[in-house]
Every structure is written in C-alpha cells, then in structure tokens.
Amino acid sequence: YAANKNLLSSDSRRNGTEEWIKQLRIIDSTTITLFSNAIFKGVGRHPRTGKKKGGIKVHSVIHANEGVPCDVQFTSAATNDSFMLAPSHYNHNEIVALDRAYINYAKFEELTDRGVVYVTKMKKNLSYEIMVDCIHQNPEGLMEYREQVVVFRKGDINHIARIITYVDIKKGKKPKLISLLT
C-alpha cells in the first residue's frame, strides 16, 4: 500500500498536475433540443432543412484539473453565450479557454485588467489592425507559428491582443487563436 498510496488514495485531487492546468477554466455550452419548435424560440438554422432548433442551452464552467463543472446555468437555446464570461468570477493568473461564441471585447478588456489570460478561436470576419507581425520557423525553414500583436476596435473599445496562427498537421489547416497580450 505504501508504494502505491497516491494512486490508491480516495483523494479525488490529481497528483502531479501541471501548475497551469490548475489555473485553467474551460467555458462551453451545448443545446438540448426539446419539443421541436412548439415551445422554445429557435436558435440558428439547421443546415439541411432550414428549420430552427428549439430547446435549452446548458452553459458550464469547468476547472480543467477537476473535470467537473463548477458553474452550470440553463437558458433558452437562443441566448447568446457571452453572458457566461463574467470577468469578476476569475482571478489574477487564471486562464480561461472559450469558443468563438464568447468573443466580447469589453469583457476581454476587463479580463486583461484583472490579469486573467484568455484563449479563444478567432472568427473569420473579425477586423483588426496589425501592429507587430512575427513568423517563427523551425530549423527546416517551415512555419511553426505566427504571432501578431493586433488592435481590435469596436465603438470606444481598443483592445490590444495577440493572434497566434499555427499549422495543424493532422487537418492541414492554420487555426488562429486570440489571446491577451502578455
């Protein structure tokens, strides 16, 4: 028992977890279809039929090192996801990973001011001004990743961030991630 105590322990906390994983919060949502369109206002359009999808949306925040939601909220399926991104719920040095539905420059500014790191995929239609552009190459001269410092402008908000573009070898694509400027 003594040799395997950490593996056999009933303590559910993970031992040996990287420190940054303990700081990572993942925000996501999923839609549960209920009653077709009879009761709930639809969200989006089905790509084949063009009909709207009704139901409820489950929004959750998960501590990555625990794998269990720490915040779960239910809304109509048509509710915009960005309400879940509440900067006051996050502390200095925490990392928040979220999808494109959560892009909100005012909230990104608040997160940056609080010292919270955020990472999200970039929407294709975002407009920005490039301030710095640097391509990092491997020894063979191929791009490993590209780092751009940019300014996103919306109304009176000027949010400085960085865009990281890397090559996804499995998919043959170049996904773009947005993160605060660190």
Tell me the role of every PLM-derived stretch:
Residues 1-10, 14-41, 45-182:
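Single, function-defining residue in the core of a domain
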